[in-house]
Amino acid sequence: MLVKNAENRGQLEFVSLENMVPQDHLLRKIDAAIDFKKIYEFVEDLYCEDNGRPSVDPVVLFKIVLIQHIYGIPSLRRTLEEVSMNLAYRWFIGYPLNEAVPHFSTVSYNFKHRFNHATVEYVFRWVLKAAAEEGYLDTEAIFVDGTHIKASANLKKQAKKAVPKQAKRYAKELFAEVNRDREEHGKKPFSDDSDKNPPQEKQTKETVVSTTDPESGVFHKGEHKKCFAYEAHTACDKHNFVLGVYVTPGNVHDSVAFDPLYDEVCRNYPEHKTVVADSAYKTPWICKRIFGSGRVLSTCYTRPKTKENGHPWWMYVYDEYFDDVICPEYRALHYSTTNREGYREYKSRAYLCKSCPTRGICTESSRCEKTVMRHIWQDYVEMAEHVRYMPVYKELYRLRKEKIERVFADAKEKHGMRYTQYRGLAQVTNWVKLKFAAMNLKKLATWKWNGRHPAPGGGKRSRLRENAPDISLLFPPVFLFSNRKPALA
């Protein structure tokens, strides 16, 4: 039977906002998970106590921004429109139906000029502390990776600019190690006197800069994808809680941004034992830093960067006893020098290579000389190679696609992190931190609610697997090295 409803748009009703929001609504779970009054402690020094006009409640401002990030709303203007019309949003911020919500420019101004990076960091750490108190964090192994965020900048509006070169963070330590190695081999150590007044071309490099957002960087992915972007270098635990994030321009390599991110993780979670990362992080310095601190780097296979149609890299074997490299024809390549980049150079004898039957696929040098380089920290890289074959670390690396990659997928597909409408590194950093704080808060609230409200019939709705096998380190790994080691061809 066809029923036509009568329009009663002008009808007056007495309703309770509390009764209009479902009991299992996500915002109810979030409101019950933590005490938002804690925010007053973070911002009280940013307001005057007895002067000026009354402000919008800072808790309301943070709740509005959390709504934006939790539901992936692209802009604050759109967020305030949704808050004005959505009953659940109004209930969450504590505004009745007949009260006007704050103007979007008020929220934007406060987060741009009043709430600084320290305030955002307090909120981010506060959510993680609440998760740790509930026992939801598992920081025995951390997963590290980076993802790009498209900047609000047109690729066609660009200019070439000379920018100063950034010194490597470990440059001093590497320089000392290089000089120590040269002295052990009877070589004169390098002097840094020549670097006091380097030529201009050595101080700067030419790069493409956006005229719209100069702090973004050109991001390349494959042969065709190219855009101005930022890079969010992120670390998470085995339960996908984001533990730290460091934002850089899109043209900064993952290995370069690793140190600031890892400093943050070590400062807050020094108990971690394993770092799981992809091949971009398998550099001599990162391997040295992780293994040197008593921890383990679990990474993947990397294809050797050797000459095509030449001898395989593993046919050049390093002899640790004699400090030589043995070539495929069983000739010794003797130590020549250690360069400033930290590589030992092993060179063959020209009179031996002239009559070598495989010289054509070994070297193209006009002097009939083969050079093999090996980094002074190569032993740590070989530790990562040995670890790669251990079952426990194989399993950890297999989980990488379910952990850090899942964090990035959720952030982009569900929470609107594929693009940013903010400009400037500071604004984008705060935006990313608040987004990850919202994701952590959503997970914390859901797990906490499921623990208090089990499913009917004794079923388990919680995603925590308390009886899951523990793949922690039962004993420190032992690495065995033979006297003959592969060298880098």
Predicted regions and their residues:
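Hydrophobic alpha-helical membrane-insertion signals
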Residues: 1-28
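Short, surface-exposed loop/turn segments at secondary-structure junctions
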Residues: 48-51, 95, 423-424
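Short amphipathic alpha-helical interface patches used for protein-protein assembly/oligomerization
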Residues: 89-93
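Short secondary-structure boundary/capping segments within folded domains
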Residues: 18-21, 53, 224
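Basic, short loop/linker segments at the boundary and entry of helix-turn-helix/winged-helix-like folds
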Residues: 23-66, 71-72
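Anion-binding and metal-coordination hotspots
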Residues: 3, 65, 72-85, 97-489
